[in-house]
A protein has these predicted regions:
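Glycine-rich flexible loops
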Residues: 2, 15-17, 39, 63, ...
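Conserved small/polar residues in nucleotide/adenosyl-binding loops
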Residues: 208-215
Length: 216
């Protein structure tokens, strides 16, 4: 449900985060300007999603917090680029529930934000891949770990609670506003990929066909 109004806020917020989060994290009170800009970025991002709503990334993060007590920021960050790749598929099984556009456009929207943040590439797909790499670099800079398992989430309990987590994420209020409407089997694969650190997929037409959740 993004609009020209929310895009301006979200794009500026993202740029401020890239420019100021590393120093705010590293230097704290010794860099008050970076802290100020991060407060501004947080406020602008809130203004954007209060009007455009959120999506699957937040739905999945809500359940990681509820079931496994991951702080919400960490839960969002650890799955972020995987959900972005899922959303950026140009031939999804189902589109979003809100008819905002006649065809999938998440890839172009991600590329637009990426270019505003200084990311380059020969086409939208390359820009998007470079954007994901830039996000992973930022996450590493501030100590975000690579997988759900890295945060000490017990494997047996993760697998035991997975189906309930998937169902609750599917029914979360944020899911309906995602640009690509997910199947529960797709949410399950995203969780498993993020837990085990499996190689990212393009998620173009993802159905749950894995022989084992431990297949990495």
């Amino acid at each position: 449900m993004a609009s020209d109004y929310t895009k301006g806020l979200s794009m500026k917020a993202a740029k401020l985060v890239f420019e100021n989060l590393p120093s705010s994290y590293e230097n704290g009170a010794n860099d008050p300007h970076a802290r100020e800009e991060m407060h501004n970025a947080s406020c602008m991002a809130g203004m954007a999603f209060a009007n455009a709503f959120l999506g699957l990334n937040h739905s999945m993060a809500h359940k990681l917090g509820a079931f496994h007590h991951l702080p919400h920021g960490i839960a969002n960050a650890v799955i972020l680029t995987r959900v972005m790749r899922y959303n950026a598929a140009e031939a999804p099984v189902k589109m979003g529930t809100f008819s905002q556009y006649p065809y999938p456009n998440a890839l172009a929207a991600y590329a637009e934000m990426a270019r505003y943040c200084g990311v380059e590439g020969k086409d939208d797909r390359e820009v998007f891949e470079n954007f994901c790499a830039k996000l992973e670099e930022l996450k590493a800079t501030i100590g975000i770990k690579g997988t759900i398992a890295d945060y000490g989430v017990d494997e047996a309990y993760f697998l035991e609670s997975l189906d309930e987590m998937v169902e609750q994420a599917f029914n979360d209020q944020c899911t309906g506003a995602n640009p690509r409407y997910p199947l529960m089997s797709e949410i399950k694969e995203l969780y498993l990929d993020a837990y085990y650190g499996r190689e990212p997929q393009d998620y173009a037409c993802l159905l749950y066909t894995s022989p084992s959740p431990r297949d990495r």
